[in-house]
């Protein structure tokens, strides 16, 4: 197996600063709720030998990549192959985490190496399921069976795509002739009805985002997990969440705002953003926002 990661750790310097500010630095528990290939975890474990990691990852394919990538830290890591919203259901009440990291961005491996149709850069089967055994429906099933009105609502609600009506109509018209099976087919359908003058990003970007979020139930999982994350922090423990689009960022922002100021404190009023230099080195980081809360 290739032991190189596809992904770059976003906002790593800011995350390390949070760990360095922890008042105690001995036998601490670090939970990575979205382990992915383990790029944040590797950088953190290399730098801080007082941390033990619990790594949570739903996709068994990418979890195996993480195991290989993090093999030198094997004695300090416990792996959990499931969705992060399931992890705390049986979590022991007397074991609290000192640092919880949540990176809500999709891994570059899923875009570039999984062959599951997360990206339109290659022609792949239109699937988008992080785990085929627990996700009930694929992206292909959605675009081939949902009504025009349901598609329009799904695309708009989960991506704020202003041309969701045009796109849903084009999808329904196309599938009358041929079943939509691949990423390039769907991208082509969308591109043909998108106003050329309005193109700042690839016309298919937001629709692909909406389908991925829906297929993997991402927003509901986030909402279910937020209370678990803060409740399972130790005193002075930190919850750090990286978001990549406005919908999930609003969910995190509103939840943090709802927390009792007697129990929790926001580290900064505004989200922490990547620097110009980081964006230059890692273009996908440009959308990242880091929000942080501390248990008092």
From Swiss-Prot:
Q: Name one Pfam family in it.
A: Methyltransf_5
GO process annotations (BP)? rRNA base methylation
Q: Where is the signal peptide?
A: none
Binding positions (S-adenosyl-L-methionine): 38-40, 57, 80, 103, 110
The domain of life for this entry's organism is Bacteria
**Record key words, sorted:** Cytoplasm, Methyltransferase, rRNA processing, S-adenosyl-L-methionine, Transferase
Q: Where found? A: Cytoplasm
Record's keyword annotation contains Methyltransferase: yes
Q: Which reaction does it catalyse?
A: cytidine(1402) in 16S rRNA + S-adenosyl-L-methionine = N(4)-methylcytidine(1402) in 16S rRNA + S-adenosyl-L-homocysteine + H(+)
What enzyme class is recorded for this protein?
transferase
Q: Could you give a GO molecular-function term held by this entry?
A: rRNA (cytosine-N4-)-methyltransferase activity
Q: What is its EC number?
A: 2.1.1.199
* One cellular component term from this protein's GO annotations in UniProt: cytoplasm
Function statement: Specifically methylates the N4 position of cytidine in position 1402 (C1402) of 16S rRNA.
The UniProt entry's sequence similarity note says: Belongs to the methyltransferase superfamily. RsmH family.
Do you know which HAMAP family this protein is assigned to?
16SrRNA_methyltr_H
The record's listing under NCBIfam families reads: 16S rRNA (cytosine(1402)-N(4))-methyltransferase RsmH (TIGR00006)
Protein name as annotated: Ribosomal RNA small subunit methyltransferase H
Q: Which organism is it from?
A: Borreliella burgdorferi (strain ATCC 35210 / DSM 4680 / CIP 102532 / B31)
The record's gene field reads rsmH
């Amino acid at each position: 197996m290739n032991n190189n990661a596809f992904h770059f750790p976003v906002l790593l310097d800011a995350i390390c600063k949070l760990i360095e500010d922890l008042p105690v630095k001995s036998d601490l528990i670090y939970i990575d709720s979205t382990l992915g290939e383990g790029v944040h975890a590797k950088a953190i474990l290399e730098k801080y030998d007082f941390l033990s990691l619990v790594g949570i990852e739903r996709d068994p394919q990418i979890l195996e990549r993480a195991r290989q990538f993090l093999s030198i830290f094997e004695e300090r890591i416990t792996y959990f192959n499931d969705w992060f919203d399931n992890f705390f259901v049986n979590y022991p009440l007397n074991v609290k985490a000192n640092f919880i990291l949540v990176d809500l961005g999709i891994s570059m491996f899923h875009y570039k190496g999984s062959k599951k149709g997360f990206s339109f850069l290659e022609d792949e089967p239109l699937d988008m399921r992080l785990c085929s055994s627990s996700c009930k429906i694929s992206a292909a099933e959605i675009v081939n069976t949902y009504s025009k009105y349901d598609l329009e609502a799904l695309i708009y609600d989960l991506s704020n795509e202003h041309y969701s009506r045009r796109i849903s109509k084009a999808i329904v018209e196309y599938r009358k002739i041929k079943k939509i099976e691949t990423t390039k087919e769907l991208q082509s359908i969308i591109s043909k009805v998108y106003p050329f003058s309005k193109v700042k990003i690839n016309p298919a970007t937001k629709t692909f985002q909406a389908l991925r979020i829906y297929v993997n139930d991402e927003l509901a999982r986030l909402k279910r997990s937020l209370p678990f994350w803060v409740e399972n922090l130790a005193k002075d423990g930190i919850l750090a969440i990286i978001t990549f689009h406005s919908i999930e960022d609003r969910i995190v922002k509103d939840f943090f705002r709802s927390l009792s100021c007697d129990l929790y404190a926001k580290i900064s009023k505004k989200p922490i953003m990547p620097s110009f230099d980081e964006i230059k080195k890692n273009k996908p980081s440009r959308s990242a926002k880091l929000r942080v809360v501390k248990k008092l």
